[in-house]
């Protein structure tokens, strides 16, 4: 049984994220989606909101668990007995950062591999930042996020409460 972790901020959880989960969950016996606290990024949604959103989108996957975490990824991976870290690469601009992160993770966790997956063509340009910006200006984000996520975005924007927690 090979366990993999797919860490990220997921702010918000997009169709691109789900695409990677769908594909990674077909490779590994168990996939743990690790929703990172990442307070330094000042997330739009609070940690519990991001966990709840991801659970709504991914609830139909039987071998996928959504778990929040703070601290080092190495500790999270060890806690879940993960052998692989899954990361998405949308563009060449992602590669340098992800390559450095993979090197650091290999140093900290020599027995854990990093697997890079590229999103399906229709999702290569999607980012949480773009989705939040479009939604905050009243634009249509239905092609980028699932209806439940769009609902969360609309409610959050209407409430004016960002960066909770």
From Swiss-Prot:
Question: Which GO CC terms are listed, alphabetically?
Answer: cytoplasm
Binding-site positions, substrate: 9, 41, 73, 87
- Keyword presence, Glycoprotein: no
Cofactor(s) for this UniProt protein: Mg(2+)
Kindly state a single biological-process term from the GO annotations of this entry.
Answer: coenzyme A biosynthetic process
Q: Which InterPro entries match?
A: Cyt_trans-like, PPAT, Rossmann-like_a/b/a_fold
* Signal sequence, start to end: none
Role: Reversibly transfers an adenylyl group from ATP to 4'-phosphopantetheine, yielding dephospho-CoA (dPCoA) and pyrophosphate.
* Entries under NCBIfam families matching the protein: coaD_prev_kdtB, cyt_tran_rel
Protein name from the UniProt record:
Phosphopantetheine adenylyltransferase
The organism of origin for this protein: Polynucleobacter asymbioticus (strain DSM 18221 / CIP 109841 / QLW-P1DMWA-1) (Polynucleobacter necessarius subsp. asymbioticus)
